[in-house]
Regions:
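N-terminal helical cap/lid subdomain that shapes the substrate entry/recognition surface
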Residues: 7-109
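Short alpha-helical
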Residues: 27-30, 106, 113, 133-134, ...
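Alpha-helical structural context
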Residues: 38-39, 83-84, 121, 173, ...
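Glycine-centered short loops/turns at secondary-structure junctions
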Residues: 121-123, 207
Length: 242
């Protein structure tokens, strides 16, 4: 954990969702293995790992602005199934997978309580990549939605996190929700997330302080500046609630 001093100035917390509050890896595994069975394939862990690599590569291209979201959603399945000589339609695969994923909202233990307690002291907003309908469904069914004053999704922003345009959209939405001059109050904001490439880079691009939620103890190999780093919710509490 890194912390400069005890006099924190933050009034607003911007939270990532997947693998920060919700266990996306577990939800993804459930949805993808159901998809394999649907197309007559054995749901092996090795196939899940192969899909992970393809999916991550596609989303990284999206974050860099080199691939459109719709292309990501289809191409990841087209690439995977073509490698296994399976005549699966990309749109059918995406629709099936998306439905299963939207039905799965597995909380990281302590996430609900953390957001509840933080919401008593700070204004909380969601900043997430992904499909809007899916993210809204998962946030609602998990019980997290009630603690956030706004939910900002890349699909609706028409720009991916970490791009500056995504955060321009977020600031404008905050203004429409009644926040006065949010862009000029960036020094009061802290972005909390697990991803160096989308969350920490996003905060850097937006001029917002960042808190890298890093429970796996990964190394910062992306040359991204991080304001503070934590490995647990307990450390977030120590910084923001005490």
């Amino acid at each position: 954990m890194m912390r400069e001093d005890g006099n924190l100035r933050y009034t607003t917390l911007l939270f990532d969702v997947d693998n920060t509050l919700l266990n996306f890896d577990a939800s993804e595994e459930e949805a993808f293995k159901s998809l394999l069975i649907y197309f007559g394939m054995e749901p092996k862990d090795s196939l899940l790992q192969e899909y992970h690599q393809i999916n991550r590569s596609c989303w990284e291209l999206f974050e860099e602005g080199k691939m459109e979201k719709e292309e990501v959603l289809l191409r990841r399945f087209e690439i995977f199934f073509s490698r296994h000589n399976c005549q699966a339609d990309g749109r059918e695969a995406e629709a099936f997978y998306r439905e299963r994923l939207g039905d799965s909202a597995i909380l990281i233990p302590g996430a609900l309580e953390l957001c509840r307690d933080l919401s008593r002291k700070y204004d909380l907003y969601v900043v997430t990549n992904g499909v809007a309908d899916t993210q809204y469904r998962r946030l609602k069914s998990s019980g997290l939605e009630q603690y956030f004053k706004g939910i900002f999704v890349s699909e609706e922003a028409k720009s991916p996190k970490p791009q500056k345009e995504f955060f321009e959209y977020c600031f404008e939405q905050m203004r429409l929700l009644g926040v006065e001059h949010p862009k000029e109050r960036r020094q009061e904001m802290l972005l909390i997330g697990d991803s160096l490439t989308s969350d920490m880079r996003g905060g850097e691009n937006a001029g917002v302080d960042t808190c890298w939620y890093n429970p796996k103890g990964l190394s910062n190999d992306k040359d991204v500046s991080v304001t503070m780093e934590v490995s647990s919710y307990e450390e977030i509490r120590e910084i923001l609630l005490f």
